[in-house]
UniProtKB/Swiss-Prot annotation:
Lineage, top ranks: Bacteria, Pseudomonadati, Pseudomonadota, Gammaproteobacteria, Oceanospirillales
UniProt gene name: secA
Bilayer-crossing regions: none
Organism in which the protein naturally occurs: Hahella chejuensis (strain KCTC 2396)
Reaction(s) catalysed (UniProt annotation): ATP + H2O + cellular proteinSide 1 = ADP + phosphate + cellular proteinSide 2
Cofactor note: May bind 1 zinc ion per subunit.
Keyword Iron set for record: no
Keyword Chloroplast: no
Keyword list, A-Z: ATP-binding, Cell inner membrane, Cell membrane, Cytoplasm, Membrane, Metal-binding, Nucleotide-binding, Protein transport, Translocase, Translocation, Transport, Zinc
Binding site for Zn(2+): C892, C894, C903, H904
A cellular-component GO term for this protein: cell envelope Sec protein transport complex
Family, as annotated: Belongs to the SecA family.
Name recorded for this polypeptide: Protein translocase subunit SecA
InterPro entries registered for this protein in UniProt: Helicase_ATP-bd (IPR014001), Helicase_C-like (IPR001650), P-loop_NTPase (IPR027417), SEC_C_motif (IPR004027), SecA (IPR000185), SecA_CS (IPR020937), SecA_DEAD (IPR011115), SecA_motor_DEAD (IPR014018)
Molecular functions per Gene Ontology: ATP binding; metal ion binding; protein-exporting ATPase activity
């Protein structure tokens, strides 16, 4: 009540922000005349003038009005496009590190040139982030003439480029690229072995186009670089044969047993074995030789089998072909639930992708091991300043504020919106709904209006396509299977009577122009004459006027999405730049959203109204129930994303520590002081194992210490003899004497090969050990994360336990790094400078090969790229052993009882 009164008196926060920026727009407009009067040389010289003023202490905010006026004038001269006042406001919103919500067709790409130009003046680099390589290249090529006219360089980073090309792109004033590529390059840079191999200059300022898609829809998508783990494809096949023998049960009433072997929860996308299911699965596994007689499925050694059963059940009962994935060229390709696009190279994790491959009876790719990872949430929070643009952000304003600290400002449209949004029509069954959609399409086509039909899955788009073919209606289908044709089909989707079926939301980033796109028609001609171009324009103008007179583009939604924002994106395709248009959603009680979240409430309403087959309900109560269901799903998804962030923040803190350590090592030519410090710590810790601090001589284990010193540091020290010969030796002096002996042994090796070679060797060993153990640590963190929910059964807070145990794992990793670095450098004898250079060359080659295969992962997944080659773990190191070579599967000579490859052989 009070807030609504206050809003009437003071205006909303959004209105106040727009009003404040309106004053700056006035100043920019006042400068327009004087800037327009400048000749070409004087206008171009402004960039250097601004840079000089920045160096003298002026701020970007002080330069903003003049810089925006210069960018606007350059746009007029180079591209024939003048920024509207609302576009100037959009530019200010972006410069201030906020999100600008701008409707479809309002010129977001042109708006970005204003803050990009201003912030590029600092020379620190500006990143413009898009959702795919096509848009990155298109936008860079489109805006490059404007930037280059003003003396700024433009680069593009896309997948498949070599390191040199990427370094050049990042060295540019402005760099365009995709969210995936920026994130992967960050990870690759933190796996490099020298500073010269790093591509990025840092994270200064980023403008994220389609910010809702990248920071919200893909927030649950980890970016992971991985290598292969052990092959278990045969096990997936065997388990896949057993799953059809299990009977699905319905969730029981409280206290009642499950009638079946397992239950499925579609909301959380999980499956759970019942008591009878556990017993039956154990019988099946034993019968097929996968479980020892009398063994329990829950024994620690068999948890992997339980994991395989769970993945197979999910593959069969929660993931459907042509909805969640398609099979293409003998591979399972994920379909993005938000856009309907395929995502080649991405794989579900935790064995799910392999289980689906087994289900589809195609080649099973190997599982993988994480080498480096982050999330989009944490990557984009690295930027000093982050901004974004989209047509639909206001519904997620709370999440942008909570997670990223970004405010959303809704920018007014340049022209008022004329689109009509009709109420939803709800039917009892899917068949009735689709028949109503077909009738609507037929009716609209007879009016010579274009129709865009949005579907939630490939399956639905193909079903609708088959119905339209039966009715003899010409149409285009745009889904994950035909995304190569995307831009062309969308460009012509505004022609009179054109019917286009698209999954959500194919063609995003390309406007549907009423009457079709005349520029696309011109582009199809090899060498068009002015007369041909004039004719194409005239024909287009006729079609354009015809469509506007008929009522503009009609958008039909065949299903409500879980997120209102995705529905608004579909609606936003119609009514661009003040054009007329209309939208309508058709629903049924059998739709996923209705069935899982809203069916009972709506069904009761429909029964109360006495609905008959073929009839539709159009009522505010129904719309409210649907909106409530969507809010419920949005809230659940927000909780999932927030929970992911809370868990990943733990790993993120550790990631920062490790990456800073790597950068410090790479930036330093001489790390001998660091080596000396950790050598002292490691020797002291080793001595303490056998001679506890403040203990008496009778408690000392001198033979064990002598053996350990030889094993760990390669020194044969007569400790017992020292003690016998010098009765004054006590715990502290003995510790110092041992350390000195280890140091002396190391110095002797250094004298043989030279200090510079040894310094280089120390760096390479430290980086190699750090990377190897960090990789193992990431795997351990994955395992910890997968099982941490079980702590809840012990009345413990899983998040707190995760933080505590993750810290312990990290502390253990740091201790192991120290120990292994010292052990390796003490056990080797470097021979030649040439061998050091060969080590560096091989390592870079292996890294380059690995980087080429880096892939993004899908939500609820960890990346699995079966072709990635695991980095060689020390096998190329140019050293000669001082001891006899031990087989990897033989017992370790240190006496630990472990296999050599799992103990001291880990780094050799």
């Amino acid at each position: 009540m009070f807030s609504s009164i206050a809003r009437k008196i003071f205006g909303s926060k959004n209105a106040r922000e727009i009003k404040r920026m309106g004053k700056v727009v006035k100043r920019i407009n006042e400068l327009e005349e004087s800037i327009s009067a400048l000749d070409e040389a004087a206008l171009k010289a402004k960039t250097q003038e601004f840079r000089s003023r920045l160096e003298k202490g002026e701020t970007l905010e002080q330069l903003l009005p003049e810089a925006f006026a210069v960018a606007r004038e350059a746009g007029k001269r180079v591209m024939g496009m003048r920024h509207f006042d609302v576009q100037l406001i959009g530019g200010m919103v972006l410069h201030e590190g906020k999100i600008a919500e701008m409707r479809t067709g309002e010129g977001k790409t042109l708006v970005a040139t204003l803050p990009v130009y201003l912030n590029a003046l600092s020379g620190k680099g500006v990143h413009v982030v898009t959702v795919n390589d096509y848009l990155a290249r298109r936008d860079a090529d489109w805006m490059r003439p404007l930037y280059e006219y003003l003396g700024l360089s433009v680069g593009v980073v896309v997948s498949g480029q070599d390191g040199e090309t990427k370094r050049a792109a990042y060295a540019s004033d402005i760099t365009y690229g995709t969210n995936n590529e920026f994130g992967f390059d960050y990870l690759r840079d933190n796996m490099a072995f020298s500073l010269t191999d790093k591509a990025q200059r840092g994270q200064h300022f980023a403008i994220v186009d389609e910010v809702d898609s990248i920071l919200i829809d893909e927030a649950r998508t980890p970016l992971i670089i991985s290598g292969p783990a052990e092959d278990s494809s045969e096990l997936y096949r065997k388990i896949n044969e057993l799953v059809p023998q299990l009977k699905k049960g319905e969730p029981p009433e409280e206290g009642q047993p499950v009638d079946g072997h397992f239950t499925v929860d579609e909301k959380s996308r999980s499956v759970e074995l019942s008591e009878s299911g556990h017993t039956y699965v154990e019988e099946l596994l034993t019968k097929n030789g996968l479980l020892e007689e009398g063994d329990s499925l829950y024994a620690a050694t068999n948890l992997g089998l339980l994991h395989h059963i769970s993945s197979a059940l999910r593959a069969h009962h929660l993931y459907s072909k042509d909805v969640d994935y398609i099979v293409q060229n003998g591979q399972v390709v994920i379909v993005d639930e938000h856009t309907g696009r395929t995502m080649p190279g991405r794989r579900w994790g935790e064995g799910l992708h392999q289980a689906i491959e087994a289900k589809e009876r195609i080649k099973i790719q190997a599982e993988s091991q994480t080498l480096a990872s982050t999330t989009f949430q944490n990557y984009f929070r690295l930027y000093e300043k982050l901004a974004g643009m989209t047509g639909t952000a206001d519904t997620e304003a709370f999440e942008f504020r909570q997670i990223y600290g970004l405010d959303v400002i809704v920018i007014p449209t340049n022209k008022p919106i004329k689109r009509i949004d009709y109420n939803d029509l709800v039917y009892l069954s899917v068949d009735e709904k689709f028949q109503a959609v077909i009738d609507d399409i037929k009716d609209t086509v007879t009016q010579n209006r274009p129709v865009l039909v949005g579907t939630a899955s490939i399956e639905a788009s193909e079903y609708l396509s088959a119905m339209l073919k039966k009715e003899g209606i010409a149409h285009n289908v745009l889904n994950a299977k035909q995304h190569e044709r995307e831009a062309h089909v969308i460009a012509q989707a505004g022609r009179p009577g054109a019917v286009t079926i698209a999954t959500n939301m194919a063609g995003r980033g390309t406007d549907i122009v009423l009457g079709g796109n005349w520029e696309a028609d011109v582009a199809e001609l090899e060498d068009p004459t002015p007369e041909q171009i004039a004719k194409i324009k005239a024909d287009w103008q006729k079609r354009h006027d015809q469509v506007i007179a008929a009522g503009g583009l009609h958008v039909v939604g065949s299903e409500r999405h879980e997120s209102r924002r995705i529905d608004n994106q579909l609606r936003g395709r119609s009514g661009r730049q003040g054009d007329p248009g209309s939208t309508r959603f058709y629903l049924s009680l059998e739709d996923n959203l209705m069935r899982i979240f809203a069916s009972d409430r709506v069904k009761n309403i429909m029964q109360a109204l006495g609905m008959q087959k073929g009839e539709a309900i159009e009522h505010r109560m129904v719309s409210n129930a649907i909106e409530k269901a969507q809010r419920k799903v949005e809230g659940r998804n927000f909780d999932i994303r927030k929970s992911l962030l809370e868990y990943d923040d733990v790993a993120n803190d550790q990631r920062h520590v490790v990456y800073e350590q790597r950068n410090e090592i790479m930036a330093t030519d001489d790390i001998s002081e660091m080596i000396d410090a950790i050598r002292g710590d490691v020797v002291s810790a080793t001595v303490s194992q056998f001679i506890p601090p403040q203990s008496i001589a009778e408690q000392w284990n001198v033979p064990g210490l002598e053996k350990q010193l030889e094993s760990d540091f390669g020194v044969d020290l007569p400790v017992q003899q020292w003690l016998d010969e010098d009765k004054r030796l006590h715990e502290e002096t003995l510790r110092e004497k041992i350390l000195q002996a280890v140091v002396d042994s190391y110095r002797e090796k250094e004298e043989v090969v030279g200090a510079s070679v040894m310094r280089n060797f120390e760096k390479q060993v430290f980086l190699q050990v750090l990377d190897t153990l960090w990789k193992e640590h990431l795997s351990n963190m994955d395992l910890l994360r997968m099982g941490i929910h079980l702590r809840g059964y012990a009345q413990k807070n899983p998040k707190q336990e995760y933080k505590r145990e993750a810290f312990e794992l990290f502390q253990n990793m740091l201790d192991t790094i120290k120990h292994d670095v010292v052990r390796v450098i003490c056990h080797v004898r470097v021979q030649k400078q040439e061998e050091m250079e060969e080590l560096e060359r091989r390592r870079r080659e292996a890294l380059a090969q690995q980087m080429q295969r880096a892939q993004a992962t899908h939500p609820e997944a960890t990346e699995e790229d079966s072709d990635a080659e695991e980095q060689a773990e020390g096998s190329d190191a140019p050293y000669v052993r001082d001891h006899k070579k031990v087989g990897r599967n033989e017992p370790c000579p240190c006496g630990s009882g472990k296999k050599y490859k799992q103990c001291h052989g880990r780094l050799e």
